[in-house]
Design a protein with these regions (language model features):
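Domain-level signature for soluble enzymes in the chorismate/prephenate branch of the shikimate pathway
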Residues: 1-133
Length: 133
């Protein structure tokens, strides 16, 4: 279930078209691939956006330190959402969407931020979609 463009871009087949209920809907799609071919798929598009999730120690300035590093590396946050970790008092997961112009700088920012986090995962990297509105 994706656009014809996405299917052509990643060498896939459209199973069903126009399944949305809102014609102005913007949906993120996920390509699940064998790790050995994932890099080949990624190279077909310009990677300039990513989704990240991380947790931090519950201490003063921990989030500010992470955000300062992203700023230093010229990483633009387009979304940040904190959700409590169920069963762990005062612990939160931070879901962050970022856009960037330089993939190497993005990877360097992840390397710089990682030691400050309790856990960090890059959920996905892809080309930012363009709005038709």
């Amino acid at each position: 279930i994706c656009s014809q463009y996405a299917a052509e871009l990643y060498g896939m087949k459209v199973l069903e078209e126009s399944i949305e209920t809102n014609k102005h809907n913007f949906t993120r799609f996920l390509v699940v691939a064998d790790p050995w071919i994932a890099d080949d798929l990624r190279k077909q598009s310009k990677v300039n956006k990513a989704n990240i999730v991380f947790s931090l120690p519950h201490s003063e300035g921990s989030l500010s330190q992470v955000l300062s590093i992203f700023s230093f590396y010229k990483i633009n946050l387009t979304k940040i959402q904190s959700l409590p970790i169920i069963g762990r008092e005062w612990q939160y997961l931070f879901y962050v969407d970022v856009i960037f112009n330089d993939y190497l700088r993005f990877r360097q920012s992840i390397d710089a931020v990682s030691p400050l986090t309790k856990e960090l995962k890059v959920l996905g990297e892809y080309e930012e979609g363009k709005s038709n509105i």
